[in-house]
Design a protein with these regions (language model features):
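Short, flexible loop/turn motifs enriched in small residues
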Residues: 98-104
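N-terminal accessory regions of nucleic-acid-interacting proteins
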Residues: 1-83
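Catalytic micro-motifs at enzyme active sites that drive phosphoryl/nucleotidyl and oxygen chemistry
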Residues: 74-79, 92-97, 125-126
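Short conserved micro-motifs on helix faces and helix-strand junctions that flank
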Residues: 10-11, 87, 160
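Acidic, Mg2+-coordinating catalytic module of metal-dependent nucleases/exonucleases
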Residues: 185-223
Length: 223
């Protein structure tokens, strides 16, 4: 989708982008090779230079560049070209805020493997691993997960981000992640009734009572 996008270019909004598509200009290559059209002639040279820059940055696999120039609501357009560089992540906490709370578990998926990070075991390994990816895919991560991680580990994550909360909302799906899953017909066998509050209880049950089953349920919920 990224190579079909023009909305990241200066002076191009959704309306102008759609107008380009309607004229048959569907890709960057189409634009660079199109016949001169009076409607865009004045700006064609400048836009062509901008598109050449996009081509170069895509060749360099610079996801952050595109993340910074795309409108925030359009970051999903990064996915097709950078899907192999995505890391899907979700965190669970003890229920406290950024300053009094702490991360209990983190679950990640890189397209091939699921990994779990547990407080008191291997949580610090997450910071080493997260920088192997270019894009972080979350649900409400821009508002919660990423700031919490940055504050907890005292680190800055400069990754490009795709926050599915905003993408799903634009498609008519609202509520929390688990609510969206239900609306999309996705089920979690054995996890009915488990929510963020119960996840805190599961952590406490594991931490204070060494209940391994509680941890396994928490990790299943986390992913």
């Amino acid at each position: 989708m990224l190579q079909n996008s023009f909305i990241q270019l200066p002076g191009v909004g959704l309306k102008k982008e759609r107008s380009l598509w309607k004229t048959g200009v569907l890709t960057w290559k189409d634009f660079l090779h199109q016949n001169e059209q009076s409607k865009y002639q004045a700006s064609k040279n400048k836009l062509s230079l901008d598109i050449e820059t996009c081509n170069n940055r895509l060749f360099e696999e610079d996801a952050t560049y595109f993340y910074n120039i795309l409108p925030p609501s359009e970051s999903w357009r990064l996915f097709k070209e950078f899907q192999d560089a995505c890391l899907y992540l979700d965190i669970e906490t003890n229920g406290g805020d950024y300053y009094s709370g702490f991360i209990t578990t983190i679950a990640t998926y890189d397209g091939n493997n699921i990994k779990y990070y547990v407080n008191g075991e291997n949580l610090d390994d997450f910071i080493n691993d997260v920088f192997d990816s270019k894009i972080l895919v979350t649900y409400n991560g821009k508002s919660f997960d990423i700031p919490f991680i940055e504050n907890y580990f005292n680190v800055k994550l400069n990754h490009a981000q795709i926050d599915l909360r905003h993408t799903l909302k634009s498609l008519g799906y609202g509520g929390g992640l688990k609510s969206c899953e239900k609306q999309l017909g996705l089920s979690r066998d054995g996890l009915e009734g488990v929510d963020g509050y119960f996840a805190i209880h599961l952590w406490n049950e594991y931490y204070y009572n060494a209940n391994q089953n509680a941890l396994e349920t928490l990790l299943a919920y986390n992913i």
